[in-house]
Regions:
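Active-site loop immediately N-terminal to the catalytic Tyr-X3-Lys motif
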Residues: 52, 101-107, 129, 167
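Residue(s) in the substrate-gating loop at a strand-loop-helix junction
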Residues: 96
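A conserved structural motif in NAD(P)-dependent oxidoreductases
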Residues: 164-173
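Substrate-binding pocket helix/loop in short-chain dehydrogenase/reductase
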Residues: 50-51, 58-63, 160
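Active-site helix of classical SDR
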Residues: 74, 112, 120
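Alpha-helical segment proximal to the catalytic Tyr-Lys
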Residues: 79, 125-129
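The beta1-alpha1 cofactor-binding region of Rossmann-like NAD(H)/NADP(H)-dependent oxidoreductases
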Residues: 17-27, 56, 172-173
C-alpha cells in the first residue's frame, strides 16, 4: 500500500479514509490536523454507461464523488495549509486519462474528470500567491481489487494494454 511505501521513506503522514460525500466529517477531520503540507486528493468512482442510457442516479453519484468531493476536500485542505503553514504546500488531484480524452461509455466519467482538470488549473492560479502548488495525475485504467473483474475479460485487457504507451497495466502498490 501507499502507506507502507511512505513509512519506508520515514515520512510522517495521515491517511483519511472516509465517505467523501460526508462534508461535515471531512471538515472535522481536516481542521483537527496540526500539520498539513501535501494533499493527495484521491476520490473517484466510475459507472460505465452509454450516453443515451445514463441514469439520474449514476450522473449524481459521479458528479458528487468525482468532482464535488474533490473540490470540497481541496478547498478545506488549502484553507488548512494556509492556516497552519505560511510557507508552502502541495495539492495533487488524482484525475484520469479520461480527463484529457473521452472514452466510449465513459461520457459522464470523462465529464467529471475534465472538471477535475479545470479545477486543478484554476486552483493553481488562485493558490499560487500562497505558495501552494497544484497539479493533477492522470493515470489510465489501474488494476485494483475493484477493477480486477474487468481484467478477466481478454478483450478488455488487450484494449487497456494497447492504449497504454508502456504496454502494461498500472497497479497500486
Amino acid at each position: 500500500s501507499l502507506g507502507k511505501t511512505i513509512k519506508k521513506l520515514n515520512v510522517k503522514y495521515t491517511s483519511l479514509n472516509c465517505d467523501v460525500n460526508d462534508y461535515k466529517r471531512i471538515k472535522n477531520n481536516i481542521i483537527k490536523l496540526k500539520k498539513l503540507d501535501i494533499l493527495v486528493n484521491n476520490a473517484g468512482t466510475n459507472i460505465p454507461e452509454p450516453f443515451l442510457k445514463v441514469t439520474g442516479s449514476s450522473l449524481e453519484t459521479l458528479l458528487n464523488v468525482n468532482t464535488k468531493a474533490v473540490f470540497n476536500v481541496a478547498q478545506l485542505c488549502a484553507n488548512q495549509i494556509i492556516k497552519l503553514n505560511k510557507k508552502n504546500g502541495s495539492i495533487i488531484n488524482i484525475s484520469s486519462i479520461f480527463g484529457l480524452v473521452a472514452g466510449r461509455d465513459r461520457t459522464v466519467y470523462s465529464m467529471t474528470k475534465f472538471g477535475v482538470e479545470g479545477l486543478t488549473r484554476g486552483m493553481a492560479l488562485d493558490l499560487a500567491k500562497y505558495n501552494i502548488r497544484v497539479n493533477s495525475v492522470c493515470p489510465n485504467i489501474v488494476l485494483t481489487p475493484r477493477t480486477k473483474k474487468y481484467f478477466a475479460n481478454k478483450k478488455y485487457n488487450k484494449y487497456v494494454k494497447e492504449s497504454t504507451p508502456l504496454d502494461k497495466v498500472a497497479t497500486i502498490s
